[in-house]
Each structure stands twice: as C-alpha cells, then as structure tokens.
C-alpha cells in the first residue's frame, strides 16, 4: 500500500512538501521514514504522521554534548537556538550518552531547525508506517 502526504509547516524540516510512503517497508539508515508520533505533545499530538530521516538504528551509540548530537562519534546535528528558546531549555539539558536498543530509531530532519529526535529521543520501530520518498 502507498500513502501520499503533504507537509504544510511554515518552515519544513525536509526539502520536499509532498511525500509518498510505502506502507510496511522497513526503516533503513539514511532513508526517509513515515511514522506516527507518540509522547511529544503538546508540540505534536499523538498519532501525527511525521516524515524524518533515519539517523541511527539499534546498536548505534548516541552522544549529545554541548549542543551537538553524535552518532558513533560522528557529528550529525546541532541544536537550534530558536528551538531551544521555544522549548525554554538550554542545550546542556539534553546532554547524555546511550546506545539504541532493539527496535529503536533516531530520526532527524534535514533542516537545522527541525524538531526531531535531538529533542525527544528515539522512536520505536512499532511507530513506523513505512519508508517515504520526497517527490515535490
């Protein structure tokens, strides 16, 4: 099955506005994935369909320090001062290190101002609807 979605945000986190999701396709590193949000309200209500890029999978080492997110010691993303201000948090509030467990994925947007796993942590593979592609 296939689903088509539209990103109507003022500032998108990915370079596309229209997406096609292949439901049931596995989430693979560096590919886009469509999933349903859980536990990140009030910013996004539970069940909101989101498309992000898989940045890390089970067994990958995550370290957040001084406003920078590292995956297996490779710098992947910086925290946005504007997002931190909106959340009323400082970058050091997110400092931590952990290893992704079975069924966990770290997802990021391509935009530096994306609201993603930098701020709310990993998602469960059970939230994944399928692989996504940006088409326009």
Where are these regions (language model features)?
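Long, low-complexity intrinsically disordered regions
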Residues: 111-112, 133
């Amino acid at each position: 099955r296939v689903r088509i979605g539209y990103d109507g945000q003022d500032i998108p986190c990915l370079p596309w506005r229209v997406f096609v999701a292949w439901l049931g396709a596995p989430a693979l590193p560096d590919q886009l994935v469509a999933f349903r949000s859980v536990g990140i309200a009030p910013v996004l209500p539970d069940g909101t369909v989101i498309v992000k890029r898989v940045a890390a999978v089970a067994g990958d080492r995550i370290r957040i320090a001084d406003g920078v997110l590292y995956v297996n010691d490779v710098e992947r993303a910086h925290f946005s001062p504007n997002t931190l201000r909106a959340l009323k948090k400082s970058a050091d509030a997110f400092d931590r290190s952990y290893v992704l467990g079975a069924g966990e994925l770290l997802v990021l947007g391509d935009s530096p101002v994306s609201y993603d796993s930098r701020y709310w942590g990993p998602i469960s593979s059970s939230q994944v609807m399928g692989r996504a592609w940006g088409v326009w």
